Swiss-Prot record:
Tissue occurrence: Wool.
Protein's name according to its UniProt entry: Keratin, high-sulfur matrix protein, IIIA3A
Coiled coil: none
Species annotation: Ovis aries (Sheep)
Domain of life: Eukaryota
Lineage: Eukaryota, Metazoa, Chordata, Craniata, Vertebrata
Role played: The keratin products of mammalian epidermal derivatives such as wool and hair consist of microfibrils embedded in a rigid matrix of other proteins. The matrix proteins include the high-sulfur and high-tyrosine keratins, having molecular weights of 6-20 kDa, whereas the microfibrils contain the larger, low-sulfur keratins (40-56 kDa).
InterPro entries, alphabetized: KAP, KRTAP_type_2-like
Pfam family, one: Keratin_B2
Transmembrane segments: none
Amino acid sequence: TGSCCGPTFSSLSCGGGCLQPCCYRDPCCCRPVSSTQTVSRPVTFVSRCTRPICEPCRRPVCCDPCSLQEGCCRPITCCPTSCQAVVCRPCCWATTCCQPVSVQCPCCRPTSCPSAPRTTCRTFRTSPCC
């Protein structure tokens, strides 16, 4: 019970079940098992958590990387560098340039990029877009 977000709390503070910290600044924002919506801080009580998620971004800076659930947008500083799979939310993109990584729909590109949907992003030296 009580707020479980902040530098002095861990994922265990909000009922456990969080596999890893969400963001460096918000270590235990969690998604309830029964809920499919993003939970914003402060989280007052979560009996069980699945995968950790970040509070919604004010701007779509990057996609939800790696194993996090769809619908979470995190600041670029929170994105792990070891990620290969990227799960996107609408109007979020991992980077402004193409990366050789697989993406899942729905995914949208920067405004300067073509709108045609693709499942694989490749890097081209002559173009900053996918």
